[in-house]
């Protein structure tokens, strides 16, 4: 959530930068309500001063002219009633301003290029080479079904579309990837968390999933209302909600494995086959809490930590700096890591790493003291996939496929696979 006073004091500049994100953004009501809020504050303060003066006058009159007290009491009641009415209206105005702020995305950082969509993203680095396959490569779902290790048909029977059963060695590969990723990240100073998969509404509000993206969430019907997490970012970021951290403890780094659940409300007709866009998928998430002036450096480090998984797996990839029109709601700066998929003959996102500034921390009330005894200030939060496990499985299937339909297992994963070096049809 943006800072109320900053939006009001720098309204034109904030609106201009937000408009580079695209979409329809009407902040006219914000200006009107903020002006009313200011007037109400002035009025309430003035009335409170009148009430205080009336109280003092009553004390004086009680000694000098007791007969005048009735008139003064009437005036005091009228002033008190007016204060009560204006304070009630002030509460309504502030609640409405808060509702507006909850729907406004983060302001892009000045280093983020302007643009309307993916075509305006900027490549900042590239690693490795595309595999030199001397045959027509297959897509991952063709390979998985031929291996007898991906079963979309039975999953549809059980759960409907956009689900799958992993089977045999491919199920083990997915599990091996999770352990491998966690091992790599914890070796770099990340602390592993195993989070809850169901969270409260205020938890989803804290990271910015709600209220704007409620249609893309799965939720329970009972009370209290709970949501299945769309990413471990949600519970892990809120791990420090309503807390004041000590500056010397920052940056705090967490990694967490979890299933992720998404309704994919706007994905009709997109990636209908395979593992790219599922209602349930696995992900290892990276989350950081940083000093305000150091979060951009932490974003660079986090992005490299995610890329390191792909380097160790020997998979060609590139890093893209997202333009203003392609960034997520809570992010002020984002790098997408895109992996090459020979079967699709295209790059596909396997990780998004974002610096959210104080946007989430303001919602979740996550603060820190730079020095002991200092006034608390909002922390900066960062998050990124390290990596999306299903999409990493896709990348292995397509990049390590052989002409006979078997798939080599990357050397780094062989110890996690009990020495197994290839996937062969069941």
Swiss-Prot record:
Main localization of the protein described in the UniProt heading: cytoplasm
Q: How does it assemble?
A: Homodimer. The tRNA molecule binds across the dimer.
Question: Which reaction is this enzyme known to catalyze?
Answer: tRNA(Ser) + L-serine + ATP = L-seryl-tRNA(Ser) + AMP + diphosphate + H(+); tRNA(Sec) + L-serine + ATP = L-seryl-tRNA(Sec) + AMP + diphosphate + H(+)
Task: Give the residues the record marks as binding ATP.
Answer: 262-264, 349-352
Enzyme Commission identifier(s):
6.1.1.11
Family per UniProt?
Belongs to the class-II aminoacyl-tRNA synthetase family. Type-1 seryl-tRNA synthetase subfamily.
Positions with a binding annotation for L-serine? 231-233, 285, 385
Q: Where are the transmembrane segments?
A: none
Would you name any one GO CC term? cytoplasm
User: Which Gene Ontology terms describe the biological processes this protein takes part in?
Assistant: selenocysteine biosynthetic process; seryl-tRNA aminoacylation
Known InterPro entries for this protein? aa-tRNA-synt_IIb, aa-tRNA-synth_II, aa-tRNA-synth_II/BPL/LPL, Ser-tRNA-ligase_type_1, Ser-tRNA-synth_1_N, SerRS_1_N_sf, SerRS_core, tRNA-bd_arm
**Where is the protein situated, by its record's location annotation?**
Cytoplasm
What information about domains appears in the record's comments? Consists of two distinct domains, a catalytic core and a N-terminal extension that is involved in tRNA binding.
Determine the domain of life of the protein's source: Bacteria
What name does UniProt use for this protein? Serine--tRNA ligase
| Signal peptide coordinates | none
Q: What is the lineage of its organism?
A: Bacteria, Pseudomonadati, Myxococcota, Myxococcia, Myxococcales
């Amino acid at each position: 959530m943006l800072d109320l006073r900053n939006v009001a004091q720098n309204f034109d500049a904030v609106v201009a930068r937000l408009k580079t994100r695209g979409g329809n953004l009407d902040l006219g009501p914000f200006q009107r309500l903020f002006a009313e809020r200011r007037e109400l504050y002035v009025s309430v303060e003035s009335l409170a001063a009148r009430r205080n003066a009336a109280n003092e006058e009553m004390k004086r009159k009680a000694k000098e002219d007791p007969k005048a007290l009735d008139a003064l009491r009437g005036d005091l009641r009228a002033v008190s009633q007016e204060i009560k009415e204006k304070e009630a209206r002030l509460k309504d105005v502030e609640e409405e301003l808060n509702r507006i702020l909850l729907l406004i995305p983060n302001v892009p950082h000045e280093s983020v290029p302007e643009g309307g969509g993916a075509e305006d993203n900027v490549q900042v680095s590239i690693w490795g080479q595309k595999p030199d396959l001397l045959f027509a490569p297959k897509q991952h779902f063709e390979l998985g079904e031929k291996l007898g290790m991906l079963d979309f048909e039975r999953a549809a029977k059980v759960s409907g579309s956009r689900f799958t059963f992993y089977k045999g060695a491919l199920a083990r590969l997915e599990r091996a990837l999770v352990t491998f990723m966690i091992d790599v990240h914890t070796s770099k100073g990340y602390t592993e968390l195993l989070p809850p998969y169901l969270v409260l509404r205020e938890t989803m509000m804290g990271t910015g999933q709600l209220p704007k993206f409620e249609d893309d969430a799965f939720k329970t019907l009972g009370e209290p209302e709970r949501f299945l997490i769309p990413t471990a970012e949600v519970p892990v970021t809120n791990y420090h909600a309503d807390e004041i951290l000590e500056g010397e403890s920052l940056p705090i780094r967490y990694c967490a494995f979890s299933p992720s659940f998404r309704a994919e409300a706007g994905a009709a007709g997109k990636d209908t086959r395979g593992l790219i866009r599922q209602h349930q998928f696995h992900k290892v998430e990276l989350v950081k809490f940083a000093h305000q002036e150091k979060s951009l450096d932490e974003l660079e480090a986090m992005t490299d930590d995610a890329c390191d998984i792909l380097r160790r797996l020997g998979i060609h990839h590139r890093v893209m700096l997202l333009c203003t029109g392609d960034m997520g709601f809570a992010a002020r700066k984002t790098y997408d890591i895109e992996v090459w998929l020979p079967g699709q003959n295209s790059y596909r996102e396997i990780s998004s790493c974002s610096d959210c500034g104080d946007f989430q921390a303001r919602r979740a009330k996550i603060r820190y003291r730079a020095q002991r005894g200092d006034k608390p200030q909002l922390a900066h939060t960062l998050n990124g996939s390290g990596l999306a496990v299903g999409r990493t499985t896709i990348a292995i299937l397509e990049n390590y496929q052989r002409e006979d339909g078997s798939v080599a297992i990357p050397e780094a994963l062989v110890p996690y696979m009990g020495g197994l070096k290839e996937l062969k049809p069941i």
